[in-house]
């Protein structure tokens, strides 16, 4: 049976939960920290001048981080299995185009917003049509190309029906921007990693050039120029390069974890995808399996360290949210508070690093690079005139990377606890990310509408708080459904 790094699966599952959950919570009535900070309630109009981040602004970077970590984990297994450079790049481009297509299909096949039972049935048919396109067996063999071609024809037929019946606009601009960006990031990140897999100095040079490119293009305000041109923005976005500042360090994390695998794990089967599952095992003997007082003390220490890291990440997010609030008022200036927070971080991070090195030696290097980029990002914050998602700032990429890596370490303890329902749901959904991303919209929601359950749920959860609970429950149900597919070794892979 294949060995896995459950903390990476769980982190990916959490990011998917966050993306879907934040998209379906009640709009305009919740506190500002429940939304993108630049889309505040009640109107949610984009305010590019607003700096700061909330937890919602973190879910996509975490997704990118998981993808970056997984690229070396799967790539090194493929290389060890004898794949040539030609085969690697052929697979890389195939997956890029399949992901690019998925960015359009997951939007164009979703007719659940239309009224009537037929629209819901067509949406469910769209979910089924994605199987011949993206289904992969547990042994990594993709569906034969004739069946994949049939899936393409079925998807095109459903899109044509939707356009005729409901007047859907079919254009190059109608796609999921998240999957669209991930496709390009996977292409660039996968290529850069392969070419620099044994030459970290070259990867560092590419990273430095990307950093310079980001500084220059943002100074010249090129992101706004390219996005304003509809002939360019459907295929090109500056963030395709900016987010590499997050993804490339994540590939180094993947290299660190890959090099720490046990010999038996080096032959793990690779059918990883974007976002990929990671063929890597948690420690063979978990803390919870040890016996005696020493084992119990270790469990207590690991649990305490995991909690401290989670609280530290929470504080960092709260700090970067609070100091940029319009109603922020404190005795010290914002710059003074940022400096004070940096000093506190410089004191706390080494202590947490010592604990990580003692309890989880495998993650020693991961913690070091996480701390480095987190501090670097906080230092860049004032230089960027505040951390921002739009336009994507350097501090946003670096802080997001640091928090993502720390969360991966903290979840290592959670993943070692004896399997529980929530762990199975998040890890199961995390191993099947493409399906998880669309399961609520084109599987669960149409069923709820067909049966009248959605109308009933909306009636009994009219208050904002109840609406949040409803959103969380429905996303968990959709992820649970996907986890059942994963347990049956039914995966969607580009």
Kindly label every feature range from the protein language model.
Residues 1-267, 285-494:
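Alpha-helical transmembrane segments and their immediate juxtamembrane cytosolic regions
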Residues 266-286:
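Long, intrinsically disordered low-complexity tandem-repeat segments
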């Amino acid at each position: 049976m294949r060995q896995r790094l459950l903390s990476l699966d769980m982190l990916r599952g959490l990011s998917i939960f966050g993306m879907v959950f934040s998209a379906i919570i009640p709009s305009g009535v919740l506190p500002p920290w429940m939304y993108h900070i630049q889309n505040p309630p009640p109107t949610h109009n984009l305010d590019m001048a607003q700096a700061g981040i909330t937890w919602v602004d973190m879910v996509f970077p975490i997704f990118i981080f998981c993808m970056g970590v997984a690229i070396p984990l799967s790539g090194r297994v493929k290389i060890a299995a004898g794949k040539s450079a030609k085969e690697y790049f052929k697979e890389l481009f195939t997956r890029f185009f399949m992901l690019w297509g998925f960015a359009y299909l997951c939007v164009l096949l979703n007719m659940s917003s239309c009224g009537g039972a037929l629209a819901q049935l067509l949406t469910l048919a769209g979910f089924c049509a994605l199987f011949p396109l993206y289904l992969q067996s547990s042994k990594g063999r993709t569906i034969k190309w004739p069946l994949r071609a049939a899936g393409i024809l079925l998807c095109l037929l459903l899109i044509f029906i939707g356009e005729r019946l409901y007047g859907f606009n079919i254009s190059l601009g109608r796609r999921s921007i998240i999957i669209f960006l991930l496709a390009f990031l996977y292409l660039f990140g996968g290529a850069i990693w392969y070419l620099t897999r044994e030459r970290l100095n070259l990867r560092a040079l590419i990273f430095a050039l990307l950093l310079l490119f980001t500084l220059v293009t943002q100074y010249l305000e090129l992101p706004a120029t390219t996005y304003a041109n509809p002939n360019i923005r459907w295929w090109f976005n500056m963030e395709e390069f900016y987010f590499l500042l997050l993804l490339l360090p994540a590939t180094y994390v993947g290299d660190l974890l890959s090099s720490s695998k046990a010999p038996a794990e080096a032959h793990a089967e690779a059918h990883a995808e974007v976002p990929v599952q990671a063929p890597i095992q948690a420690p063979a003997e978990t803390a919870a399996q040890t016996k005696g007082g020493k084992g119990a003390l270790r469990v207590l220490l690991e649990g305490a360290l995991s909690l401290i890291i989670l609280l530290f990440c929470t504080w960092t997010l709260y700090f970067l949210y609070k100091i940029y609030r319009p109603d922020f008022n404190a005795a010290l200036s914002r710059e003074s508070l940022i400096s004070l927070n940096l000093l506190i971080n410089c004191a706390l991070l080494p202590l947490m690093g010592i604990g990580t090195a003692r309890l989880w030696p495998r993650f020693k290097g991961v913690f070091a690079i996480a701390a480095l980029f987190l501090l670097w990002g906080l230092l860049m914050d004032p230089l960027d005139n505040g951390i921002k998602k739009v336009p994507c700032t350097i501090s946003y990429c670096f802080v997001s990377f640091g928090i993502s890596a720390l969360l991966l370490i903290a979840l290592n303890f959670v993943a070692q606890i004896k399997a529980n329902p929530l762990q199975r749901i998040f890890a199961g959904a995390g191993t099947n990310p493409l399906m998880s991303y669309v399961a609520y919209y084109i599987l669960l929601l149409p069923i709820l509408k067909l049966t009248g359950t959605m109308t009933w749920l909306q009636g009994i959860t009219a208050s904002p708080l109840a609406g949040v609970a409803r959103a969380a429950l429905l996303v968990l149900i959709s992820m649970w459904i996907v986890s059942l597919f994963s347990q049956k070794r039914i995966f969607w892979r580009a």
